[in-house]
């Protein structure tokens, strides 16, 4: 494993991964619904200099409603496209992405003894979670093109 990586060179691997993730992100961000609304919102830095081999996104219908990440994951899985969805076991990032305040979180947790993902969505009136797409050493351009082709199937669709 390590000898293989050393034989290629970490700088070459990083350059290739950056190229693939930039191609993917730019391709996704270029897709618009016929009414001009964006299909994808990407979280994190806009540039690629300090971005690793993944992007965190959500898909939206033509009216701007977020398409549930679980639906996206089911659709991609049926096409043998591997993504990760949810809150990524990363406390705080989802709250930042959706502008959920400390006060809202305190109010939620102080008002119940238990609850789950759907319960907090209903309480806050805000969607939670996102989709993470990762590329790496084994990713080829065809893999990225398949994800972009999938994204095109969401254009102008209502869920």
Regions found by a protein language model. Give the residues of each.
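Pyridoxal 5′-phosphate
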Residues: 1-159
């Amino acid at each position: 494993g390590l000898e293989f990586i050393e034989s290629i060179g970490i700088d070459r691997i990083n350059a290739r991964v950056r190229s693939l993730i930039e191609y993917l992100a730019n391709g996704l961000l270029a897709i618009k619904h016929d009414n001009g609304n964006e299909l994808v919102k990407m979280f994190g830095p806009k540039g690629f200099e300090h971005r690793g081999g993944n992007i965190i996104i959500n898909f939206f219908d033509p009216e701007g409603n977020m398409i549930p990440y679980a639906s996206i994951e089911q659709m991609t899985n049926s096409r043998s496209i591997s993504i990760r969805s949810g809150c990524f076991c990363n406390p705080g990032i989802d709250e930042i992405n959706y502008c959920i305040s400390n006060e809202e979180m305190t109010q939620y947790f102080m008002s119940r003894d238990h609850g789950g993902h759907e319960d907090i969505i209903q309480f806050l009136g805000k969607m939670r979670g996102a989709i993470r797409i990762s590329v790496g050493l084994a990713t080829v351009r065809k893999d990225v093109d398949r994800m972009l082709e999938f994204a095109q199937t969401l254009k102008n669709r209502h869920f």
